[in-house]
Amino acid sequence: MGSDWDEIKRLAADFQKAQLTSTLQKLSERNCVEIVTLLLEKQLLEVVFTNNGKEYITPDHLEREIQDELYANGGRANLVEVSRTLNVDLSRIVALAERIAAENPLVHLVLGQLIDEDYISHIAQEINEKLALRGEISISDLASQFDLPSEFLQQDVVEKHLGKIIKGRQDATNPRVFFTQAYIQRCKAKIRGALAAITRPTNVAVILQQINVQEKIFHSLLDEISPAGQVTSKLANAQYVPHIYAKTQADWVNSFYKQNSFLEYDAINKLGISDAKSYIRKQFPNEEFLFLKRVALGARLVELTVVTALNECSATKQYLDLTTILPSNLSEEDIEEVFSAIMAQKHSNPSNFVYLDSIVFSQPYLTELVQPCHALAEAQAKAAIDSGVYQQFVVEKTLAQKGNASFQDQDDDGKLDKRDERRKKASSGKAGGGAQGRETKTKSTKKHQRRSAAAQNDSDDEDDVQHQGSRGAGGGGGNKKTVKPLDLVKTADIEKLINASLQEEGLEHLAPSIAALYLNQLNQAALAKAQELYEATPQTNRRQTHAAIQDRINTLLIDIRLYEKGLKLFSHDTQTQLVKYLLKSLGNDICNELSLYVASECNLTVKNTSLNVDQRIKLAQECDAEYRSALLEQNKALNKSIDDFELATESVLKACSMIIKKVDKKKDRLLIADHKNKLQQQLLDCQEPALLLHLAALILFTTISGCILHASGKFVSAILQHIRGSLSDQQNDMLLRYHDLVLQVLQTAPESDDSKIAHEQLQIMQSKVVELAQNYTRASVSKAD
């Protein structure tokens, strides 16, 4: 202690000496400014100027003054206020405040404010007092009160001092809420008392309103309380159901189900249970139910009663009234739903039963019941034939089908004309054409089937590869003609026959339903019988034969006309040979068809249907005079021109009372396209080189000329020569090479080396020839008029 006092005396003496000593040299204010400026320029000194520039201060001293301001303001200082108090730029204050907060862990920079631990401890004490007063507090309330960020309050204030300064606990479901244990105990007491007083289902919202407890606290404390009841859910419309009430519900449901083996949803809903199906599943976990729209049937009622009764009904071939075995309070809709559900679960075969107004009939029972109606159907069919009603129906139906076919043809032709017009507009004005100007393949909604026609061999005895067929009209157009269905059996007739049997069982009220059920079936049986009787009449057979031959002849004449256009593109000599071949093949078919028809009309016996010229002449001389001259003239016309043959054929058709169809040139393109498609299909299936070349030549001719051609294999060279100008040199060389190899194979021995080499080369070139024929197109296609 004495040494300290001596030290104080020595310092006082030094201080007195300094005061008494006079300054050797005083500096003026200007000199001081210059010295400071020089130090600043040489960066030997760092100062901070005030806002007015009249004063300056070192950063370290400014930092001390900021800390003094923090202390003077109780541990929380707003940097804007500090800047105004110290008369220093705010940016300087902020920079130093950040340095202070970074260097001192006890100081925090929050939203432009410096806050130290003393202030944090102070507000923690305030929070603790408020929590003790209210019992619960949230971070959002504290943020509003202290004007501080909620994250800062939660992490650096509340959670940091929780259990120390702040006496409370954090809500597990909501970390931003804190409460005291005493508050929790008060809430538990309120909840326990309220739930103990409830004897019927009560809305949770009503309970919370009465006891003034928050919903989240109610649900979090409910499990800890273990009340004598349960809450239906945690949603807004949740209810609290006391166990005593739930037990009463369960006892009633169990008792009702035990007595009746079914449960009504409405009855369960009246007990205060909203989801009846879920409640039933929960109440009877080991029971199987058939859940319907209004009721739930137990498995015992379904299996032991209904299914057993249905099986017995099927075995005895009788009927079953379901109202006698099902509960009386089930409506007809419920009973029908029960039956449908049982059939859907395949407890029994659905095809064995018919359900009508709560009555289930076995199929054999109904079959036996309507058995007399089949005799009625046959009688009605015979009466319709005898009276001509069915014949009139057939005629009207045929006319309607022809009318629909004509509408479809007009529609298809109109579409085809529009497509042609669009193609012409698109191609007009274009020079050349190239790949962009090629002909577009037109699809038709009508299908033409061209029958195979066996062509006779010409002088070179070569096989023909052309196959023509009869064409059938496709579906109808928009204005279809309909024929009223012919009902040979009436509902009243069926009711009259089955009513007597139903009256014995007291089921006469079901007669109209059963009659309607079998009306269509009996009508179809009657129509089938009428058709059978109709086809059995000789007159009908003759009329059908007449119509079929007329259609075939017209088809062949159209084919000849189309082939004639194609052969006219060749030279005169080749054209003459093609005409001769055409008449020997298709013309011969026409003569045979008509000769056989006339022989049938004249009751002449013909052993062989493939007739030659001499046989046809002999047959014509034996037939009636009205046919004789026309048939003889037609046979002679086979060696003349196509026009002569067509005129002779028209005479024969006139004698046979057959009609020649009017030429419809609009259909030509469709027929040509169909013919080409058939040739292409044959080409894809063909493996024989000679036939393949023949088909390829015909397809290329059709593509290039737009016409079809009926030619045998000997005309392949002429066809290739004709289309030569439309193909490239490479394509021509390939076809000629393939043609030469085919001739080599035909002219050499099959087992020779030359033949084998030629076969190998043909196999290599085959795909190229097929590809050329299938994919070749031209910008413009020349067509015969």
UniProtKB/Swiss-Prot annotation:
Family to which this protein belongs: Belongs to the UFL1 family.
Enzyme Commission number(s) of this protein: 2.3.2.-
InterPro entries: Ufl1, Ufl1-like_C, Ufl1_dom, Ufl1_N
Cross-referenced Pfam families: E3_UFM1_ligase (PF09743), UFL1 (PF23659), UFL1_C (PF25041)
Keywords associated with the record: Transferase, Ubl conjugation pathway
PANTHER family xref list: E3 UFM1-PROTEIN LIGASE 1
Protein's organism: Drosophila pseudoobscura pseudoobscura (Fruit fly)
One BP term from GO: protein K69-linked ufmylation
GO (cellular component) term, any one: endoplasmic reticulum membrane
Protein name from the UniProt record: E3 UFM1-protein ligase 1 homolog
